[in-house]
Amino acid sequence: MKYISILFLGLFFIIGCGDNEKNNPAEGKDGQNEYSFDSTALKTETLDNPNQAFYLRYKFKTGEKVRYRVTSIMNNRQHIEADTVMDQNVKQTAVYLIDIDPVEVDAESVAELKLTIKSIKVNASANEESFSFETGTSKDSSEIVKFAEYAALTNNSFSIRLSKSGEILEIFKVDKIVNQYLKIKGYADSLNAENKVVVRNQIITTGLKPILSQVFRELPEKKVAKDSTWSFVQPTSRILIFQMEATTVYKITNLEKYEDNVVALFDASLITKVEGQTKYTDRGINYTFKKPITTAAGKVYFNVESGLILKSKTDVNISMANTMEMDSPKGKIKGSQSENQKITYIVEKI
């Protein structure tokens, strides 16, 4: 039976930081747990003047490299009723170690940054089957092909141009990533220039932007203080047959001190508007979709003095469902599908 699979697109434009999780997924080199992520709240102190006004700005300086650990945790539960009943539970944790090297900062504080994803560790399970992959350690060619997207991203530097308010103006110099991906997949000599452009755009959109959007957040141009709010309208996205408009809303909750630095804490939330017809017919199958429900919340710690995110955590929950009906020689066949996904993103400056 043909069945439309519900695909959830991670909402990468919200940031936040929780305060009660700690996990240790893998041991790193020399006994150091490079992949150990910690989402517990930073232990900040009270600032003498928490009501002062300030600017939120990125302040990268040439020669001062920065490393981040970005962790993505996905839990997906799917229930399908058709000829049979099927439940599936998929979990995946991916940890990225990213080096940022400021190459140039111009007079308008636009920074050219060279980024290198040094390594990626993936732990996943689908129902009772588990697997793991760490870039740079596997010698199994079939395993590398299976995880080509991760393998190609690792140790192939690329560049971005970033405004002082966190807007990514350009992503470029991704040729090494594209070429490595095509080589691993065996397409290096078989794709024409047009198809290579398509692959390049897909790598930027699905491989790089989700990670970059966790480290670089759009900040307000105006001066802010405690209780200040600002928002950004995101590009319209398509989920199945629906168009979704999303607005990220931020609010400064406090100004505190961490290791003698002034740190701004701000909450993030998401407002969504979903439009589109709920009914869809494809090759004789009639589908009725419920509009997706999306919620997101969290907190971010931003070092006002150094102009960098210190820590953040994103919690995004998405629920979608649909029913289907089709005619057959034995009468009508009906089915239903529901899917609930929670995605957590943790960013740590290390």
Protein language model annotation of sequence segments:
Residues 13-16:
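C-terminal motif of bacterial Sec signal peptides marking the signal peptidase cleavage site
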Residues 19-350:
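Signature of exported/secreted
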Residues 1-5, 18-20:
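Positively charged n-region of N-terminal signal peptides that target proteins for export
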